[in-house]
A protein has these predicted regions:
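ATP-dependent carboxylate activation and anion-phosphoryl transfer catalytic cores
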Residues: 3-176
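Single conserved hydrophobic/aromatic residue that forms the stacking wall/gate
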Residues: 175-184
Length: 184
């Protein structure tokens, strides 16, 4: 991967990237994408039922990472203001509605320093971080998933889902930095 900040850097970066791709994978095709300065990783928990109802259960921020692994998962995001939070929530519901999504899902975005946001992916399941949302909303998302899978309507409408307080989940990583000692 290479970041190109000036147009005159593009040709050389593309040539090098194609060469590396060819050597590593036998194919010199490359993908160009926008580089986001100071990215924030924000995800919205959503639910859809068989009756055409969709809700979001607010956001989680997981921008603090090490080696692309989440360290902190936090709700609400300290980065989002009310306007951006509303825009992203609406985009999440629009995505769910577009595919008539059923069950629990997570719509993930990257947000730049300029507060522009970009869709990354949708995870079509409850994620391991869902207790952050449960703590902040007071709702049992596993129960919701079972009810929706059984054909029931969503238990609450959007205006009944209110965040309460602040929730943080932390992961502790241990890395052995000394040479491994046999038997230890």
């Amino acid at each position: 991967m290479r970041v190109v900040r000036q147009l005159n850097e593009l040709e050389e970066a593309l040539t090098l990237s194609r060469s590396e791709a060819k050597n590593a994978f036998g194919d010199d095709n490359v993908l160009l994408e926008r580089f986001i300065e100071g990215p924030r990783h924000i995800e919205f928990q959503i639910f859809g039922d068989q009756h055409g109802n969709f809700v979001h259960l607010h956001e989680r921020e997981c921008s603090i990472q090490r080696r692309h692994q989440k360290i902190l998962e936090e709700s609400p995001s300290p980065f989002l203001d009310g306007t951006l939070r509303k825009q992203m929530a609406e985009a999440s519901l629009k995505a769910a509605n577009a595919v008539q999504y059923l069950g629990a899902g997570t719509v993930e975005f990257i947000v730049g320093e300029d507060r522009s946001f970009y869709f990354i992916e949708m995870n079509t399941r409850l994620q391991v971080e869902h207790p952050v949302t449960e703590m902040q909303t007071g709702l049992d998302l596993v129960e919701w998933q079972i009810r929706v899978a059984s054909g029931e309507k969503l238990p609450l409408d959007q205006d009944q889902i209110r965040p309460q307080g602040h929730s943080i989940e932390a992961v502790s990583y241990t890395h052995l930095t000394l040479p491994t000692i046999v038997g230890v």
